[in-house]
Design a protein with these regions (language model features):
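PLP-dependent class I/II
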Residues: 7-14, 19-36, 63-340
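Glycine-rich loop-to-alpha-helix module at the N-terminal edge of alpha/beta enzyme cores
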Residues: 16, 39-44, 57-60, 64
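Short beta-strand to alpha-helix junction loop
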Residues: 49-50
Length: 340
């Protein structure tokens, strides 16, 4: 549908299929990026693993979320966006045929990168309980096997907006420990919460600090989609392998983007809390407008799902009807999981 909308060239169409935002990035990030454009050191292949100021800022951000000390030189490398970081991690930890547990539905970009790295996604469905998304914990336990190499988590997750509870995290940690598997955690939206509850980071759970690899990004919380800057933080035991993959896969990061990302992570006024309040208000408005339609309220993030089958039509049919009325929404049939 996005391609069809592009072909029409109608600027008045309401584009709901892509996760963009109109809330501006932090002012400090824009200023630092503009300054970097004129500097020789920002127009270089070096340093291959990312500038120190960004690695240091990302390490401090990780410590603030987890309470765990992080050595920026030994435990943090910069990636060309969050998804590039996820792929680098998967390439470092997977052998062909290894299984990666992931919730269903999940963002197609994550699922496809599991497959690109030679892994096999094992889908664990989300359930609707009390009007909210919940992880099927019995299915999670059943998905574990001798081939399980990793559990790929995201909270809030795309496209459902599920925010994992303490109980869900405890079971995820138990399964990871039982399978001797990594938890690969996409933390791109971890503070975009509408629940009022504190962030639960899996690395902060008992015994998980040496089992969790965290991928961060400035795209969502900091509204810096076009910068294509992320970072990876993990135990020293795996970071050398991830660094070698990064050097082979991407070589270097976005030189003029990294100073802006470092400024965003270090800014006293990063705008995340204000942006989250605005996103929550928009969510509430959408839920109010769609009160007669079966929408499961997201507890965080940038997206929500509508159960079109209760309206007597498939996701594709509903997407086409919206398109005909000038709105673009992604059909669940296009997601590579099993839940549509």
């Amino acid at each position: 549908m996005g391609n069809a909308a592009d072909a029409l060239g109608n600027a008045d169409m309401l584009r709901l299929e892509n996760l963009d935002t109109d809330i501006a990035p932090p002012k400090a990030a824009i200023e630092a990026t503009l300054a970097a454009v004129t500097r020789d050191d920002a127009n270089s292949y070096l340093p291959f693993l990312g500038i120190h100021s960004l690695r240091d800022a990302a390490a401090k951000r990780f410590t603030a979320s987890t309470g765990i000390d992080c050595d920026p030189e030994a435990q943090c490398i910069v990636s060309a966006g969050g998804l590039s970081g996820v792929l680098n991690c998967l390439l470092a930890i997977l052998e062909p045929g290894d299984e990666v547990i992931i919730s269903d539905p999940a963002y197609a970009g994550l699922i496809n990168r599991i497959r690109l790295a030679g892994g096999v996604p094992k889908f664990v469905p989300l359930l609707v309980v009390g009007g909210r998304w919940r992880l099927d914990l019995d299915a999670l336990r059943d998905a574990a096997s001798a081939k399980t190499r990793a559990i790929l988590t995201m909270s809030p997750s795309m496209p459902s907006g599920i925010v994992h509870t303490a109980e869900e995290w405890a079971v995820i940690a138990d399964v990871a420990e039982r399978c001797d598997a990594w938890i690969l955690h996409d933390a791109a939206m971890e503070r975009i919460l509408f629940t009022g509850a504190p962030v639960i980071h899996p690395a902060s759970l008992p015994g998980m600090a040496e089992r969790v690899i965290t991928v961060g990004s400035v795209s969502k919380e900091y509204r810096m989609i076009g910068w294509r800057v992320g970072w990876i933080i993990g135990p020293k035991s795996i970071m050398n392998d991830i660094g070698l993959v990064s050097l082979t896969n991407v070589v270097c990061q976005v030189g003029i983007g990294m100073p802006g990302a470092a400024a965003a992570l270090s800014a006293e006024q990063d705008g995340v809390a204000e942006a989250t309040r605005e996103w929550e208000a928009r969510r509430d408005l959408i839920l109010k407008e769609l009160h007669d339609i079966p929408v499961v309220a997201p507890d965080g993030g940038w997206s929500l799902l509508i159960d079109t089958q209760t309206l007597g039509m498939s996701p594709g049919e509903a997407s086409q009807k919206l398109f005909d009325k000038g709105a673009i929404a992604e059909a669940g049939e296009n997601l590579p999981g099993k839940t549509h």
